[in-house]
Design a protein with these regions (language model features):
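Short secondary-structure boundary/capping segments
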Residues: 39, 94, 134-136, 161-163
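Alpha-helix N-cap/helix-start and coil->helix boundary motif
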Residues: 14, 110, 151, 189-190
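Conserved beta-strand-loop-alpha-helix hinge in the C-terminal portion
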Residues: 127-150, 155
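Short, surface-exposed beta-edge/turn micro-motifs
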Residues: 59, 140-141, 168
Length: 204
């Protein structure tokens, strides 16, 4: 599913159903109608009159109504307000409660990925920096904050990413490679991505 609605702007959600029900043999009209109700989408208003958030919800309703096992989504919550984003994430969580279903999505909103993803991958300029189980990644990494002049207490092989500001530094480290004397803090997916990306930029 792309990050923009692909439906002609003169169509209504009801028209969308009429077209797609002929294209998909597994189309579930009742499920589509239920999703329109859940998303508070007016069935008779043309697409051109819908907000960006409503268009995204319409695209998601159409994608789910033909009962797929795999959803591929590009920035599904991009540009949406927090309430609309939570609504999209709730639907995706409901979808993946069935263990035969999966969602593959790309997003720059890392807090969304942290909420719903089991596995995460980071691509930077075509290079795969990591592909890991999310919980294992956040548990195996940590952040050390210290004066920049004290960076040499960190074993070189333990440092995965680094950010300096001239006085202090933040280092993304492998927790199991730290000496006992070094205090490390729990980290988040967002910190991991930011520190790894910063480190890669400085190496280029």
């Amino acid at each position: 599913m792309p990050d923009e609605s692909y439906f002609p702007e003169m169509l209504t959600p009801r028209d969308v159903a009429a077209v797609l029900s002929r294209a998909y043999t597994r189309w579930d009209g009742a499920a589509y109608a239920a999703l329109l109700d859940r998303f508070a989408l007016p069935a008779r208003k043309p697409v051109r009159s819908l907000s960006r958030g409503m268009r995204m919800k319409l695209s998601l309703a159409a994608a789910l109504a033909h009962r797929p096992r795999l959803l591929v989504l590009d920035e599904p919550t991009g540009g949406l307000d927090p309430v609309a984003r939570d609504g999209i994430l709730d639907i995706l969580n409901d979808f993946t409660r069935d263990e035969t279903h999966a969602v593959l999505l790309s997003s720059h909103i890392l807090s969304d990925l942290e909420k719903i993803c089991d596995y995460v991958a980071l691509l930077r300029r075509g290079k795969l920096l990591f592909c890991e189980e999310k919980d294992r990644l956040t548990e195996s990494c940590a952040v050390v904050r210290l004066p920049e002049r004290e960076l040499d207490i960190l074993p070189e092989h333990a440092v995965l990413g680094l950010r300096r500001n001239g006085y202090a530094a933040e280092a993304l480290v492998r927790r199991d490679a730290l000496p006992p004397s070094v205090t490390a803090e729990r980290t988040t997916l967002e910190e991991i991505v930011l520190l790894l990306s910063k480190h890669e930029t400085e190496r280029e």
